[in-house]
Amino acid sequence: MQVDLLGSAQSAHALHLFHQHSPLVHCMTNDVVQTFTANTLLALGASPAMVIETEEASQFAAIASALLINVGTLTQPRAQAMRAAVEQAKSSQTPWTLDPVAVGALDYRRHFCHELLSFKPAAIRGNASEIMALAGIANGGRGVDTTDAAANAIPAAQTLARETGAIVVVTGEVDYVTDGHRAVGIHGGDPLMTKVVGTGCALSAVVAACCALPGDTLENVASACHWMKQAGERAVARSEGLGSFVPHFLDALWQLTQEVQA
C-alpha cells in the first residue's frame, strides 16, 4: 500500500476545526500522565475531563465529544469503569480511542483490550510493538517501550484497521496512520520526545478529540500527529533538556493554534 504524506494545508485546516469545535474529551487515562494530557488538550483548544468513577464514567461518556481509554495503569475497578464508559459511548455514538499501553507484554490488559475492540473504537494509537500485539501478529515490547520499528507494523495496522473499522496510528520516528485502505506518513519530531513521560499518551487524547471533528477522520487524526511533532521540534530547539522541554512544548502547541487563527 502506498503511504502518502500529509500536507501542511490539511494540517492547518484540521487545527482550525479543532480550535473552532473545542471538543470535550473524556480522558480515562493512566495516573502518570493526567496533568500533561489535560494541559496538552487545553493548549490546543480542547476541554479535558478526567472522570473515572464507574457510574460517572458511563454518564459522562454520553455527553462528551470523545472518549479516550488508556490502559497504562489498569486495575480491575478501572477496567470496570472503562468497560461501562465504552458501552455507553457505543450506545451514544461517542467516538472513542484506545491506547493499548504495554499490551504486548502483559496478558490481563491484552485480553481486556481485545474485549473492548468489540465495541468498535474510532481510533487506536500505539507504538509498533503494541499495534502488532493487538493485531495478534506478535507479542513484544519492553514494557511500555517498543522493540519494533514503526514501518514494520504497517501491515499489522492495516489488518487491525480493516478488522475493527478504526483509524490505526503507529507512532515512531515516522508516524503512520491508516484506515486499512489508505495510509499517511508523518515525519518530524525529535528523539527527545521519547524521553519525556506522556507524549504518546497525550497524543492519544488529541487523536480522540480529532475523531469528533467533521470531515475526513483519517486526515484529522494524521494532523494530530503532525501538530505534536511540530511542537516537539520547536520545544527541543528552545529547551536545554528534559526539564525545560515540557513548558516549551505546551507553549509551542498554543502558538500553533494562534498561527492558524491569525
UniProtKB/Swiss-Prot annotation:
Keywords: ATP-binding, Kinase, Magnesium, Metal-binding, Nucleotide-binding, Thiamine biosynthesis, Transferase. Pathway: Cofactor biosynthesis; thiamine diphosphate biosynthesis; 4-methyl-5-(2-phosphoethyl)-thiazole from 5-(2-hydroxyethyl)-4-methylthiazole: step 1/1. One of its GO terms (biological process) is thiamine diphosphate biosynthetic process. It catalyses: 5-(2-hydroxyethyl)-4-methylthiazole + ATP = 4-methyl-5-(2-phosphooxyethyl)-thiazole + ADP + H(+). ATP binds at R125, T171. Its EC number is 2.7.1.50. Catalyzes the phosphorylation of the hydroxyl group of 4-methyl-5-beta-hydroxyethylthiazole (THZ). HAMAP family: Thz_kinase. This is Hydroxyethylthiazole kinase. It comes from Shigella sonnei (strain Ss046). The gene is thiM.
